[in-house]
C-alpha cells in the first residue's frame, strides 16, 4: 500500500545510507491530495455560484480503499475534516462502513437515494467501491460530482465530454 509500506522501505534504506527521495516525494504528493480535492471542489462550486460554506456535500466512500470496511489512513477522512473546517455540511455513504466514530461522535452512513442526491450540492467520490453503490443513480441525480477515483466512467456508459456535471481529479 503506497501510503505506508514504502515508508518502511525508506526507513530501512536509510539504515544502510541509501536515500529514497522518489518515495518521499510520492508520499508528500499523497499527503497533499486531500487539500487539493477540497480546493478543487471549492472551485467547482464557485463555478456554480455556490460557496463551499453551507454547501451540502456527500462523500461517497470513506474506506481506505475499495470494497473494504477499514478507514484507517483513509484520505476521505482528511477531506471530510477540511470540508467541515470550511463550513460545508458533510454526510457520507459507504456500503462497507455503516457507522464511524470521529471526534467522539458516531456518524451513520446515509441511505443513498434520489432525494438525498438531488438535495446535495455536490458528491465527492472518495473511494472506488465496486459493490453496493448505484453509480448510475449517482450520475443521474447528483447536481455536481467530483470523482477522485475515476470510477463512474468505468462502471457506467457516461460520455465524459457530454456530462458537464461530472469532474475527474
Language-model segment annotations:
Residues 1-169:
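Structural/interface elements that position substrates and couple domains in central-metabolism enzymes
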Amino acid at each position: 500500500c503506497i501510503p505506508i509500506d514504502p515508508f518502511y522501505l525508506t526507513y530501512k534504506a536509510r539504515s544502510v545510507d541509501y536515500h529514497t527521495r522518489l518515495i518521499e516525494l510520492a508520499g508528500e504528493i499523497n499527503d497533499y491530495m486531500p487539500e487539493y480535492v477540497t480546493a478543487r471542489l471549492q472551485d467547482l462550486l464557485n463555478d456554480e455560484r455556490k460557496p463551499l460554506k453551507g454547501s451540502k456535500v456527500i462523500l461517497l466512500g470513506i474506506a481506505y480503499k475499495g470494497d473494504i470496511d477499514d478507514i484507517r489512513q483513509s484520505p476521505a477522512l482528511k477531506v471530510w475534516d477540511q470540508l467541515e473546517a470550511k463550513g460545508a455540511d458533510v454526510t457520507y455513504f459507504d456500503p462497507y462502513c455503516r457507522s464511524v466514530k470521529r471526534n467522539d461522535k458516531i456518524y451513520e452512513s446515509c441511505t443513498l437515494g434520489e432525494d438525498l442526491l438531488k438535495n446535495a450540492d455536490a458528491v465527492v467520490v472518495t473511494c472506488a467501491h465496486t459493490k453496493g453503490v448505484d453509480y448510475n443513480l449517482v450520475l443521474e441525480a447528483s447536481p455536481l460530482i467530483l470523482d477522485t477515483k475515476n470510477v463512474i466512467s468505468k462502471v457506467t456508459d457516461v460520455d465524459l465530454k457530454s456530462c458537464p456535471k461530472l469532474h475527474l481529479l
